[in-house]
Amino acid sequence: MASYILRRILVTIPVMAIVALFVFSLLYIAPGDPAAVIAGDQASPADVERIRQSLGLDRPFLVQFGTWLWRILHFDLGNSIFTNLPVTSMIVQRIEPTLSLMLLTLVLTLVVAVPLGVVAAWKAGSLIDRAIMAFAVSAFSLPVFVVGYVLAYVFALELEWAPVQGYTPIAEGFWPWLQSLILPSIALGCVHIALIARITRASMLEVLQQDYIRTGRAKGLGQRSILFVHALKNAAVPIVTVIGIGVALLIGGAVVTESVFAIPGLGRLTVDAILRRDYPVIQGVVLMFSFLYTLVNLLVDLTYTIIDPRIRY
């Protein structure tokens, strides 16, 4: 196991290097000149050129990339073009709402989706199964922002059960924190609940047809023990795989959700940076999300060996 973990970490190094190259290339792929954006519309060509030199944009591409990568290795993501604040500190200030939203959404998804998928497989072909699958198809088809606006209107504006917008840090209390995130988590989690419920149902149906399940039933094992102890454990590998892939969807969905509910997280920071063409901030956030997704994939691979002892590396 230790050798496998070491190999996986070594594999992530070239992956992150390629990601870093792509992120840095955004400066050249994106339209517009960062120096001209900083200088403003009234600046002369000489002013723009002076800013280019101060930013090092007049140097060769590989030299700029090497300098930028060296700073990254020292946790220096540069400064924002507009606020002149360190990008690292901006990310640290905004990361709590985003991670809180993603973690709460993930917990909500697992608590709801896995039991729904298990029940749908247990009652395959019944009215309950069809109702769950109809809900899954409907939830999967709805955009995050549509669900968000509907939830905000019904439960925040009309019923006043939760705040419409904003975020309350968990340091100010668990209940206010939960109230500020419950509607965004439901809006963001609908697609993931639908996806994981369908995958759980399909995986459980395959496992429930195996001989050892029939043997357990013949020996008098209870239905709950068969479903949640024996069948679910052996059906968990595809579910964990989809959960790992779903982290990328969570990252993308968090950007939209934070915009709908005015949550001051990394999603809002990214949108504001894109609108202002604040390239250092965009690069820093994308690089951080890429590292997070790579780490999640590593954890998913390690989880395989825990839930299925037959998998060895």
What are the residue ranges of the model-derived segments?
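An internal, D/E-rich "acidic patch" concept
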Residues: 58-114
